[in-house]
């Protein structure tokens, strides 16, 4: 795992001279907590595990598979029926009739059903792609949440060390009679606050680890830590390229297919206006006359009252609704995409500003304040203020870093990548 600039800022503060202010090699960073090498989780491993074990993705796969069965069922023809009737219970005068009847669908019902079922299958496939993209985005966001939380723990531990050093300096000055006891009291309060923040950071890390593990159905995290490169910010494409990618995203394709599905369902209902006929053929055995009689027939329902007019109207309105929903989907996804792009740009630019100005300046200010305090040139209050500025800068950098990765994951989710 590559190290971010945060531990460098802490190391610079602890080593009295900021790393950004000298041309030599960077100061050594604090070592991460000991973890078995086999337990370090990479992003590729997290994605592969989620694709394999996610209950939600498995449910989406089953939903897509079920649509194949619906397509098969839509193409079958009605079953024939056989009817046997006996007239008269006396054998000598009995007539036994056996009839085979076959329904015949008219009006293109079967073709309309097959088309609608095919569109439903295509929509299910796009929904599966969207579910996979949602899972990928969630894993990436949760993965970097863990990575940032790990870094936050290291930063908070470094802040505790800084507060401990400040307390030792204050106690030495108080013991030497160079400062009032109030300074050591303030230093103890600052150390207590740093420890509280460190415990909160550790709790946030455990919550982030659980959230990541839950994405593949693990009630407890089955990894110790993640390995992520926090030095490299994700990149985004140009707006025009993102808009073009949105137009072909699974959600937009599913929306267009839903419009076609609405029209196909309307055709299904229209086809039901034409009644199906039933053809029959059979034989009647007349025992009294000792001969067989062939029988043929056709049954035609008369559409005098029920012409499926209500369902046709309902399907028409549903078709209009699908068109309206598609327009709403296009507008919403475009707005979401632009919002995520704006959030990403803000976070990425802020992260660069933190790296270039805030973190080096905060470390240098703390170093100068501590040296001045040791020399008796500045007050302890100024040291505490510089210490808080350094800590807030570190935490602020991690927050914008997490926002950048979250916004990047949101962009990928919207585009269905």
Regions found by a protein language model. Name each.
Residues 114-118, 181-189, 380-387:
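Short, charged, amphipathic alpha-helical segments
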Residues 40-43, 80-131, 253-330, 340-343, ...:
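Small/polar-residue-enriched beta-strand and adjacent coil segments characteristic
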Residues 7-18:
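Bacterial N-terminal signal peptides
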Residues 22, 131-244, 248, 340, ...:
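Periplasmic alpha-helical coiled-coil/stalk elements that build and connect Gram-negative outer-membrane
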Residues 21-87, 94, 101-104, 112, ...:
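Bacterial Sec-pathway N-terminal export signals of envelope proteins
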Residues 2-7, 22, 27-29, 35, ...:
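Acidic, low-complexity, intrinsically disordered peripheral segments
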Residues 59-71, 131, 135-156, 165-168, ...:
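Amphipathic alpha-helical coiled-coil segments
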């Amino acid at each position: 795992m590559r190290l971010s600039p945060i531990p460098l800022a802490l190391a610079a503060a602890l080593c009295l001279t900021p790393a950004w202010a000298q041309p030599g090699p960077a100061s050594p960073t604090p070592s991460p907590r000991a973890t078995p090498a086999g337990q370090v989780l990479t992003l590729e491993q997290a994605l592969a595990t989620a694709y394999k074990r996610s209950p939600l993705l498995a449910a989406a796969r089953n939903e897509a598979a079920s649509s194949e069965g619906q397509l098969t069922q839509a193409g079958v023809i009605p079953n024939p029926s056989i009817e046997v009737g006996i007239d008269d219970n006396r054998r000598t005068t009995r007539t036994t009739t056996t009839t085979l009847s076959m329904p015949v669908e008219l009006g293109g019902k079967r073709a309309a059903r097959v088309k609608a079922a095919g569109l439903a299958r295509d929509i299910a496939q796009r929904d599966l792609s969207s579910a996979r993209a949602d899972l990928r985005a969630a894993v990436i966001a949760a993965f970097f949440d863990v990575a940032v939380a790990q870094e936050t723990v290291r930063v908070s531990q470094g802040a505790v060390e800084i507060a401990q050093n400040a307390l030792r300096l204050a106690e030495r000055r108080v013991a030497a009679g160079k400062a009032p006891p109030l300074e050591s009291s303030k230093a103890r309060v600052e150390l207590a606050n740093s420890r509280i923040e460190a415990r909160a950071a550790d709790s946030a890390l455990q919550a982030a680890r659980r959230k990541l593990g839950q994405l593949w159905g693990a009630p407890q995290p089955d990894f110790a830590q993640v390995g992520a490169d926090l030095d490299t910010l994700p990149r985004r494409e140009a707006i025009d390229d993102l808009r073009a990618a949105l137009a072909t995203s699974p959600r937009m394709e599913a929306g267009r297919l839903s419009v076609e599905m609405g029209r196909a369902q309307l055709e299904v209902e229209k086809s039901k206006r034409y009644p199906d006929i039933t053809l029959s053929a059979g034989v009647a055995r007349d025992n009294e006359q000792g001969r067989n009689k062939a029988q043929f027939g056709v049954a035609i329902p008369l559409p005098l009252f029920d012409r499926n007019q209500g369902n046709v109207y309902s399907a028409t309105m549903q078709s209009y609704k699908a068109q309206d929903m598609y327009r709403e989907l296009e507008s919403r996804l475009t707005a979401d995409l632009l919002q995520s792009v704006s959030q990403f740009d803000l976070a990425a630019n802020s992260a660069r500003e933190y790296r270039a100005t805030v973190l080096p300046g905060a470390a240098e200010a703390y170093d100068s304040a501590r040296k001045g305090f040791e020399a008796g040139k500045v007050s302890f209050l100024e040291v505490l203020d510089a210490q808080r500025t350094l800590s807030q800068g570190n935490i602020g950098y991690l927050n914008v870093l997490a926002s950048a990765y979250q916004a990047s994951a949101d962009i990928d989710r919207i585009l269905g990548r």
